[in-house]
Amino acid sequence: MNHAKSEAVHAEALQHIVGGVNSPSRSYKAVGGGSPVAMVRGKGAYFWDVDGNRYIDYLAAYGPIVTGHGHPHIAKAITHAAENGTLFGTPTEYEVTFANMLKEAIPSMDKVRFNNSGTEAVMTTIRVARAYTGRTKIMKFAGCYHGHFDLVLVAAGSGPATLGTPDSAGVTTSTAEEVITVPFNNPEAFTEAMNTWGDEIAAILIEPIVGNFGIVEPNPGFLELVHATAKEKGALTIYDEVITAFRFHYGGAQNLLGLTPDLTALGKVIGGGLPIGAYGGRKEIMDTVAPLGPAYQAGTMAGNPASMQAGIACLEVLQTPGIYDEMDRLGGILEEGILAAAKEHGVTITLNRLKGALTIYFTDVKVENYEQAENSNGEIFGRFFKLMLEQGVNLAPSKYEAWFLTTEHTEADILETIKAVNYAFSQLS
């Protein structure tokens, strides 16, 4: 493929934008460097770069594009918003309709509040949990990304009962000491940390199904232990469903798992491709939010008509019978094809899949937590990524990220992808 125009775009971007990208995950640093491909158009399961190359898209904008690019029903809603006003700074009927749709889909949310991103949603659930409990510490799990605000950019200490350390320049030690980080799917480490700090913890923040070091499901009984211990210690449970909500079925991962968190943070999919965040939970907890209570949260763009109408339209599309089953079916075909190709070419991988999302790890270790995900060979993944890109298959440029199917992928797309995987693996072996 010719990428001359993409290279020129990146060279110009480096003159004006920090690192040439507006999010570090878009850089190709983790796959050996080079100029990121600059896209110009998307439709359905595909997008096209500035050089005219077409790609089957499994990035899906890191998850939000579950209905594919440019879905006509969502595009119509966005056009209506553009023609009738995208921002009023007042209440609208759209936010009421959308909030009710979210409540019906995720029954743990008695009340909802909108904001502008998953980061904002998680950040505010922590503030609300602190206000409600009167405590300050939070617990999170290693490798789970919850946004870029200070409190969640904290690495684990030297053991499960130790305080966290800053995971980014600019995060203070005092902030890090408010965070306890433990391994996902490790009941012993979790229990030890809760025995040490449980009475000081305001909330346990967790992805019910991990999406940020690949697709990793909780082991049987692990989330149940988290809930039971939180209740015993008087801490709240916060589910970060920014990736998982409406990705695997119509509703939250919590519905699939049969569990009820105290608070839930949403984003990505629910915006229909526009910026959005939302959070919700039990009425008595949510009533601590201003103007009813002392926990302040506001936003000029929160609940804007464009995002609300796009979100409503997206959820209407996702109510179509059978679409999640079809993504699961296609995901199964893709999984079988990848595993068969790996066996044929002697490439060592572990593959985790849940319905229409999967991750390939270049390791022989079963991946159930972040430490095991780190075993995936980044150098091999970088080569694989570029081999796939040159065949017109676009993946996230990181060994930790998931492949996301959309409602617009077809079996022909899957077979074309498997053919590309076969060639890529043949070059790696």
Swiss-Prot record:
Signal peptide: none annotated. It holds the Pfam family Aminotran_3. The keyword Isomerase applies. This is Glutamate-1-semialdehyde 2,1-aminomutase 1. Its main location: cytoplasm. One of its GO terms (biological process) is protoporphyrinogen IX biosynthetic process. It is found in: Cytoplasm. One of its GO terms (molecular function) is glutamate-1-semialdehyde 2,1-aminomutase activity. The modification N6-(pyridoxal phosphate)lysine is found at K268. It comes from Lysinibacillus sphaericus (strain C3-41).
